[in-house]
Amino acid sequence: MKNINPTHTHAWKSLEAHKAELSNITIQDLFKQEKNRFDDYSLTFNNQILIDFSKNNINQTTLSHLRQLAQECALDSAKEAMFTGEKINRTENRAVLHTALRNRTNTPVLVDGKDVMPEVNAVLAKMKDFCQRIISGEWKGYTGKAITDVVNIGIGGSDLGPYMVTEALRPYKNHLNMHFVSNVDGTHIAETLKKVNPETTLFLVASKTFTTQETMTNAQSARDWLLKAAKDESAVAKHFAALSTNAKDVEKFGIDTNNMFEFWDWVGGRYSLWSAIGLSIALSIGFENFEALLNGAHEMDKHFLSTPIEQNIPTTLALVGLWNTNFLGAQTEAILPYDQYLHRFAAYFQQGNMESNGKYVDRDGNVIKNYQTGPIIWGEPGTNGQHAFYQLIHQGTTLIPCDFIAPAQRHNPLADHHNKLLSNFFAQTEALAFGKTKEEVEAEFVKAGKSLDDVKNIVPFKVFTGNKPTNSILVQKITPFTLGALIAMYEHKIFVQGVIFNIFSFDQWGVELGKQLANRILPELTDSEKVASHDSSTNGLINQFKAWR
């Protein structure tokens, strides 16, 4: 990948000038100027996903400059570099090949001259066999009973992705009950163990190194709990499997290495649900549905790699998002799914985006001073959010671009629930774009029989300025295929922005310092002695903790 400071490009300078030209033009104005705006600013994928980005403060000139920016930042060659196994994660000297995990064509993908696809397919075949044994009931626990509950123990990408997907695809789940434990707070594992039976529970320990502190602490507690009931070390092998590469420690734990599922250092944690880390997904929805998830992502990969920039969905979303943050001043983006099954979707891409693009040093090692990198990502399902934080989106002083996501077809046809849900989905983007003027507010009062003199003091509070940017993402139905495509779409959006920001999107050094300090502090918490080895604040907090515990 080439290292190009985006602010040094001709396109960036053109965008700065263009921003001034658009400064007095609103989204409302743009819809008046462009009669076919919906048709001209929407894209479809596979006739199953519609992306409407017309309610952004952009015109064709904006898009032209943004596409030129992508070209000047060598996006096409960066895409090629990622898909062909070049080591674009330079700080860790690794390839970035989550796309190979869902490569359904078996086209060779080379890392250091070796095709990785045979190994990828071998792990998938092993996962398929394992899933069939668990789901069919062939696999027995230590008392001869079939498995009824699966507990995935992981953290970060080993937890967020599988949990999000299993929740999103609950309509496809089988009889197995799925549980996810991540937090090192003992409450998380303790409350989970209260719900399950040691005779019929399978634990998946998801840690590449088998040394992750949070994961191994929880795994050890689960092991102790099992052995308290089984009273036989051999029971561990019947109730634990590992998603790891550390065969020595896996075996030492008591897990049969035949039930160890490998993945590779070219799979980043936040992109790992497509790998063996997705075993909990496959167990929950069945391996055929897991393959459909991979197929959807693969189709989006093909779209991203080969579709011209004008029709390229992930690239378009990335460019519009970059415009909103770097030229219109937004610092956050909200992801708002109008589907309760997608209740962890925003949290998943909070990690995906912020851990990838939350960087202040560019690929040349220079501190970034004159542009913004990754935005803050957050969100909750609609309509819950409407009764919580939409007030600020509508009438606050902070610009918050939003992605609204909704399925046209429902999984639970209850009365008119879905029409009511979708009426809110459509209404919110319309309200954010067009608002309500002072004149419209006054007209409503007059129609209700009020005099303008009586309501003049309340009118300003009921005005909505509008001009708030949104994308509407309408999915025909949330299926394994469409969910896979949606996830891959956001992954590639993040990649495109990282390329243009001139940062390394696939490392996460920012998580290391806190872990290092925690390892230093942990031994200091074992006794009652006062500490004085830190700053006064940290010393004071530790000493108060010791006094109160």
UniProtKB/Swiss-Prot annotation:
Does this UniProt record's set of keywords contain Lipid biosynthesis?
no
Query: What's the gene?
Result: pgi
**Main role?**
Catalyzes the reversible isomerization of glucose-6-phosphate to fructose-6-phosphate.
What molecular function does GO assign, one term? glucose-6-phosphate isomerase activity
Q: Which NCBIfam families match?
A: PRK00179.1
| Protein's pathway | Carbohydrate biosynthesis; gluconeogenesis; Carbohydrate degradation; glycolysis; D-glyceraldehyde 3-phosphate and glycerone phosphate from D-glucose: step 2/4
* Enzyme Commission code(s) on record: 5.3.1.9
Q: Which Pfam families match?
A: PGI
Q: Which UniProt keywords apply?
A: Cytoplasm, Gluconeogenesis, Glycolysis, Isomerase
Database matches in InterPro entries = G6P_Isomerase, G6P_Isomerase_C, Phosphoglucose_isomerase_CS, SIS_dom_sf, SIS_PGI_1, SIS_PGI_2
The reply on keyword Transcription is: no
Record organism: Haemophilus influenzae (strain ATCC 51907 / DSM 11121 / KW20 / Rd)
- One GO cellular component term, please give it: cytosol
Tell me the protein's name.
Answer: Glucose-6-phosphate isomerase
Q: Which domain of life is it from?
A: Bacteria
- Top-level EC class as recorded in UniProt: isomerase
